[in-house]
Each structure stands twice: as C-alpha cells, then as structure tokens.
A protein has these predicted regions:
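Short, surface-exposed recognition loops or helix-turn segments adjacent to catalytic cores
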Residues: 59-69, 87, 166-170
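Positively charged, Gly/Ser-enriched RNA/tRNA-binding surfaces
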Residues: 1-57, 103-262
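Acidic, His- and aromatic-enriched active-site or binding-groove loops in soluble protein domains
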Residues: 79-98
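Short, conserved phosphate-binding/catalytic loop or strand-edge motifs used
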Residues: 23-28, 64-72
Length: 264
C-alpha cells in the first residue's frame, strides 16, 4: 500500500549559491511513497495546487518538466560532463541567448537541434509536445519523458487544474536525484519558487528502502512574503480552547478536552 506523509519543519542548505542568503528555511510538504504511476504524479500536483489556493493565492503557476529530458538530450548530443554542466548553468540562469550560442557550436542533426530549441519555451501546448514527441523518435529517454508529460496532461484534466499548470522542457533542478517529473511554483511578489517538487524513485534505496516516491515542499518564507506583498490576509481559525484545571479534576478535564476536540 502506498504511504502518504506530510511534514512541517526547518531545513538547512549549505551551498556556495546561498552566500548572502539565509541557509535555514521553513518547509511544509507532502510525500507519496510506493506509487510510481502517472496518476500519483497528478495527485501530488493537484495537492500542490490545492495548497496554494488554501493559502489564499489566486494568481500562481506551476511549471512542470521532466528530469530525464535534459539528460536524454545531452546524452543524444554526445556532450561531455563539462559541457553538460556548462549547459545546465546557462539554463538555470535563464540565459537562453547563451544556450543558443552553445548549441550552435555543436555538431548535431536537425531533430536534436529542434529539440534543443524547445528549452526556452515556458508554456508548451499540446501540439508542441506532440511535435516534440515525433522529433524524439529514436531517442528513448527523450521520448519517454515527453510521453509522460502528455499522459500527465490527460490525468490532470480530471482535477480541473489545467489553468494553473504549464509545461517547460527546459526546467531543471539543482538536485540530481530526481527521476521523473519535476515542478516549481511561482507567483507575484517573490523572485524565488514558492513550491518545488518531483519524482525520486531511486533515492530511498540509499536509505534501505527501494520504493517509488514523489513529493513537494512549500517554501513557507517565500509563500508568506508573496502573500504579504499581494495584500492577502492569512485566515486565522479562532476555534482554540484552553482548559484550566486542578489535579483532582484531571479525568473530567480530559473528557472535556476530548469533547471540544471532536466538535472542532
């Protein structure tokens, strides 16, 4: 049976990229472990969108890509490890003019060149993904990644959240453990993602459990900053109760607290 978990806590990132920035942040997230299906991908994305809506946000977008598209593309083009890192940095910095210059310097066939040309499209439509699928014939990793995104679109229609989802083949992550879809959420009032997530089917094997998994993490600090800058009030549920009692009234107090809990 799949396991569903949620959490809230502080995380620490020790990276040179975080110079001048806080290395500690608060995250709230959920994980679905033991289900490697596309329907599980859709469920987590739906939960991500629902979480954003429950926070009070109305204008946000979740960009969805696939980790294996980038790896498949660089493998098919025969890039060295150093070239792959150079390209990754250009894409991460959204330097697509640099990407164009980089790709022009490489020798490859027209199909691969057209696939590289999709890296700067932040909102791929069905027909563009279908065209990419045709171009990817003969390149299994690229083909599989695009096919997964097309199937995912169909699953997401059941949730009615299409307007919050966009598809971006140039989406990459700083973390190399992702094996399937990856996604990031953005809104007004913050330059950083407010939520990140993806599929990591091989990560748990390093901790003694071989299981498919997918999850997301809301960056609470970024979310709160966005809510403040958009003048969105965070709803406060005022239904808490405080029961004060003497030791002799312990049993009665417990019964009362349970009754209060069940009514809220």
């Amino acid at each position: 049976m799949p396991v569903k978990l949620c959490y809230l806590g502080n995380t620490f990132i020790n990276s040179s990229d975080y110079q001048g920035r806080l290395k500690e942040s608060t995250q709230c997230g959920a994980e679905l472990i033991g289900d490697g299906s596309i329907s599980a991908d859709a469920e987590i994305l739906s939960m991500t969108v629902e979480s954003m809506l429950e926070s009070g946000l109305k204008n946000f977008q979740i960009s969805v890509g696939h980790s294996q598209f980038f790896y498949g593309l660089t493998k098919a083009a025969g890039l060295s490890g150093e070239q792959e890192e150079d390209l990754r940095e250009l894409i991460a910095n959204k330097n697509f003019f640099g990407v164009e210059v980089f790709v022009d310097s490489l020798s490859m066939n027209d199909k691969l060149r057209k696939l590289f040309g999709l890296l700067d499209n932040f909102d791929l439509q069905d027909e563009q993904l279908m065209e990419a699928l045709k171009l990817a014939e003969g390149y299994d990793e690229i083909l599989s990644s695009i096919d997964t995104l097309l199937k995912l679109r169909e699953y997401l229609k059941a949730y009615g959240i299409e307007k919050y989802i966009s598809y971006e083949l140039g989406l990459i992550s700083d973390y190399t453990y992702y094996t399937g879809i990856i996604f990031q959420g953005y809104t007004y009032g913050t330059g950083e993602p407010i939520v990140k997530g993806g599929r990591y089917d091989k990560l748990l094997s390093h901790f003694g459990k071989d299981a498919a998994a997918i999850g997301f993490a809301i960056v609470v600090d970024q979310l709160m900053a966005a809510l403040s800058r958009q003048d969105i009030d965070v709803p406060v549920i005022e239904n808490s109760s405080l029961i004060v009692f003497e030791e002799a009234a312990y049993h009665a107090a417990i019964k009362r607290s349970m009754a209060v809990s069940y009514t809220h």
